[in-house]
Regions:
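Short, compact, well-ordered microdomains
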Residues: 87-123
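C-terminal motif of bacterial Sec signal peptides marking the signal peptidase cleavage site
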Residues: 14-17
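Bacterial N-terminal signal peptides that target proteins for export
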Residues: 1-7
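Post-signal peptide N-terminal segment of mature Sec-exported envelope proteins
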Residues: 26-48
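Intrinsically disordered, low-complexity boundary segments flanking structured domains
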Residues: 42-45, 68-73, 97-100
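Bacterial signal peptide processing site
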Residues: 19-21
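Short, non-transmembrane alpha-helical segments in secretory-pathway proteins
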Residues: 50-84
Length: 123
């Protein structure tokens, strides 16, 4: 039960763009606001994010740098995207961030990030 509540609180803070938790909030209206050339303070591995099985794994990060890394990854691949939804999913003992975006060309995408390596690590 406590984990469920923690997940809901974390998701609410992300939706609200809480800068004290993540160090980042999406631009107004969910529009991409990452400056060109910003480098992630994390490492990426895994797949292309098109499914949970192909999730982008974010490692070597805290919650602050890991969440920021998600937005940087999206900016690098979908410049000018608009975030429509962000939520947590728990499957097979791992934690995923599901992000639904609309790319600048108008196409919708759902991207999965495996955030297990940094989930709950504030420092």
């Amino acid at each position: 039960m406590r984990l469920h509540v923690l997940c809901l609180v974390f998701a609410a803070m992300i939706f609200a763009g809480c800068e004290t938790m993540t160090g980042y909030s999406p631009g107004a209206g969910g529009y991409d606001s990452v400056p060109d050339g910003e480098k992630a303070q994390a490492t990426f591995s895994g797949g292309d994010g098109s499914s949970i099985q192909q999730a982008v794994i974010i490692a070597d990060a805290t919650e602050k740098t890991g969440v920021r890394a998600e937005y940087i990854w999206l900016h690098e691949r979908y410049p000018g995207y608009r975030l429509r939804f962000q939520g947590l999913r728990h499957e097979a003992g791992r934690v995923y961030d599901e992000m639904r975006i609309v790319a600048a060309d108008g196409k919708s995408h759902t991207i999965f990030f495996d955030i297990t390596p940094f989930f709950g690590k504030l420092r």
